[in-house]
Amino acid sequence: MAIYSILIHPDPRLRLPAQPVTHFDDALAEIVQNMYETMYHFHGIGLAAPQVNIQQRLIVMDVPQRSAEEGEKAEQIPSDKLVLVNPEIVQRSEECQDYEEGCLSLPNQYALVTRPANITVRYQDITGATQERAAQGLLSVCIQHEIDHLNGGLFIDHLSRLKRERLEKKLAKSLKNTKKS
């Protein structure tokens, strides 16, 4: 197993659209395992292949589920570990939700992003079998966020120009200070 390097914005490779996966073999399984290792190493809940300079339509996720009962403290329950190959959103709700998003490619930068609250995603699993799944809450946000990466997008693309530029300046300053250390 290997831990990949994460591409950091404004690396232009993050803006390249990924190509469909066509081979469902041991090499793909190894990439998936390495992506999980990388995601866990950097404390992420989702990782798209383009973030590790693999230009394929491939996502790994391990999204914590929480109890939806109101008035109670959200209880941690088993996570939703998913591999999505060649995913596409086939249905979006009109209802939207705001969620504070972060990204391994924009370290320590967060912003409130509005996205459809509920989606249905069609994808292939690691064997190439077509699957379809409904998602809501954090899982819905994570799927949409990672699919943005496959299309050459970032969560900051959903922000106003002013908020995006402010966040990019904070990131540049943070990276500059990290290099000095």
Curated annotation (Swiss-Prot):
Chain sites annotated for binding Fe cation: 103, 145, 149
One of the GO BP terms on file: co-translational protein modification
The UniProt record lists the keyword Hydrolase: yes
SUPFAM superfamilies for this protein: Peptide deformylase (SSF56420)
GO terms of molecular function: metal ion binding; peptide deformylase activity
Essential cofactor(s): Fe(2+)
Cofactor note (record): Binds 1 Fe(2+) ion.
CDD domains, A to Z: Pep_deformylase
Enzyme Commission no: 3.5.1.88
Keywords: Hydrolase, Iron, Metal-binding, Protein biosynthesis
Keyword Iron: yes
Catalysed reactions listed for this entry: N-terminal N-formyl-L-methionyl-[peptide] + H2O = N-terminal L-methionyl-[peptide] + formate
Top-tier EC class: hydrolase
Pfam families found in the cross-reference section: Pep_deformylase
Record's function text: Removes the formyl group from the N-terminal Met of newly synthesized proteins. Requires at least a dipeptide for an efficient rate of reaction. N-terminal L-methionine is a prerequisite for activity but the enzyme has broad specificity at other positions.
Family: Belongs to the polypeptide deformylase family.
Protein name in UniProt: Peptide deformylase
Native species: Dichelobacter nodosus (strain VCS1703A)
Lineage of source species: Bacteria, Pseudomonadati, Pseudomonadota, Gammaproteobacteria, Cardiobacteriales
